[in-house]
A protein has these predicted regions:
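Glycine-rich loop(s) and the adjacent beta-strand/alpha-helix scaffold that form part
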Residues: 45-46, 50, 103-111
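A conserved FAD-binding loop/helix module that cradles the flavin
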Residues: 25, 89-109
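Alpha-helix capping and helix-loop boundary segments enriched in small/acidic/polar residues
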Residues: 70, 88-96, 118-121, 153-157
């Protein structure tokens, strides 16, 4: 089996499943093949010629919709009222899926209420960077959020998120009255120290 014909070798890592297990995970070995092919490949690895497979790997494949067909609200440009989030947008990862689901859900609810969508700018948060990148840039592999993708990475910090996103969080309605009061006082305190 030749998965990448231009490569003559491939690095793998043998990782113990846990301290209490004798199972080893062969990280880097492709599992998008039937069991007989997985065994044959494993037997070519020095030291694993007689290894026993505990569970065969499997492949998961996903379809995706080109994110360039979405508005920054994650609503489809082709079908009004249809919002997309997660892997179907060409992203990978729990955080990426969660933040898109949040934005798509908020904007779907706002659409029903005839309210303007909530758009997070690149300068306001990594959610904004992710959405802007997937709808405006071609990404060759599933997209992951990385600080290096943001030109605002020095200002997109956890310690100032409440100042950057407070107004939108308040507008969306995800903050309790107590939290709003607390954050307004915190913002006032920070601003008074900056003057």
């Amino acid at each position: 089996v030749i998965n990448f014909p231009d490569k003559t070798n491939h690095q793998i890592f043998l990782e113990l499943e846990s301290a209490d297990s004798e199972e080893v995970y062969v990280n880097g070995l492709t599992t998008a093949m039937p069991p007989f092919a997985q065994e044959a490949m494993m037997r070519t690895i020095a030291g694993l010629e007689n290894a026993r497979v505990m569970r065969y790997g499997y492949a998961v494949e996903y379809d995706y919709a080109p994110a360039s067909q979405l508005y920054p609200s994650l609503e489809s440009k082709k079908i009004e009222g249809l919002f997309f989030a997660g892997q179907i947008n060409g992203t990978s990862g729990y955080e990426e899926a969660a933040c898109q689901g949040f934005i798509a859900g908020v904007n779907a609810a706002r659409k029903v209420d005839n309210k303007e969508p909530v758009i997070i700018d690149r300068s306001e948060g990594y959610i904004g960077v992710l959405i802007d990148d997937i709808i405006h840039k071609k990404t060759p592999e599933p997209y992951r959020v990385l600080p290096s993708r943001s030109e605002y990475r020095l200002t997109l910090r956890f310690d100032n998120a409440f100042m950057r996103l407070f107004k939108k969080a308040k507008e969306i309605g995800i903050l309790s009255k107590e939290r709003i009061d607390y954050l307004e006082k915190a913002i006032e305190t920070v601003n008074s120290c900056l003057l």
